[in-house]
């Protein structure tokens, strides 16, 4: 894929916007939607008999990475995690009592923070506690995020014994200057060694996370990182655009702002990334993922079954996601719920015997329609009008008359093509896919101030 950008086009489309891991985005959640609504929606979800996906947030980290946009607790003092895990078990009890026992878990993810902040014993114990409360389906996808700097041989064994079958390693960039600037020093040799040990342990699916747009990155420097990553031969690669939002994440103010690549340079970097990974045999998935052709993600994209949730792209469209732990987000078919963000609030609520939800959102009919359109854009690189019309009983061109008018400019700029029965994302538009999705975002139209990362 070769995409040419002129400076005017970059200037025109480089604006803040959501990443659409949900629609509406989490910025629309309201504190009026709390525990009682969650309980009601959990009970109602049993009628759908949908399988479950579980997310567990392990918020602890040994040190802060300056690019990080996650909700983390920095602590060198081990022991802080024990009472937290016990409370997460209590939260599971509070939630699982409302769920039919025959609903199988087909996907589980531990994120953070740093899940391998936990000791080998804690990893095994905590997974046993989860299995006591939930029934797992055959061939469930069980994944964990790992920080290679702190990963021990004992942890690798414990993770394998606990039943994990997918690994995600945070690499970000292999350039020493960039690593120092973002406070995450991890030499290539270390990543290579951990990858080899994970392969020896029998893990068949390993994902590497990269970030472009970090201080001191150039197309030339990041090309070296990409070449080394290709040598490591991961099954999947996620290449995220750095979300620089110092107004939301104050620690990002410690990054040298003058060393951040321009929007133009970021696009040069990502064009190189796309070309390099495709030349190496990876399939370009959605907005920012790459996978081997036989990988489930690539198969799902070919079948039009890709979906997005708060962990990014997923092959499990028809599942309902339950989030456990501080700050985690659950996604039922018709509603979203988020737990308290601070440990103090989370602990206090669980200790009172309440589900620790502090805000959420219940979708209306317009939200359902727009979510399907936006997810099709983000996942399937286009929208078929007839599909949306059949699902919701609307006339697409009438319902979205204003949006189709707005899209004419994007069509002139070569981002999309509006055909008889569909909107098709063109190669250039793929790099600006969030901008295309934003046209269909009814909530964004009402927003004055945008606390989102920039689209480029």
UniProtKB/Swiss-Prot annotation:
It is found in: Cytoplasm. One of its GO terms (molecular function) is metal ion binding. One of its GO terms (cellular component) is cytoplasm. It catalyses: coproporphyrinogen III + 2 S-adenosyl-L-methionine = protoporphyrinogen IX + 2 5'-deoxyadenosine + 2 L-methionine + 2 CO2. S-adenosyl-L-methionine 1 binds at residues 55, 112, 145, 329. Pfam families: HemN_C, Radical_SAM. Monomer. This is Oxygen-independent coproporphyrinogen III oxidase.
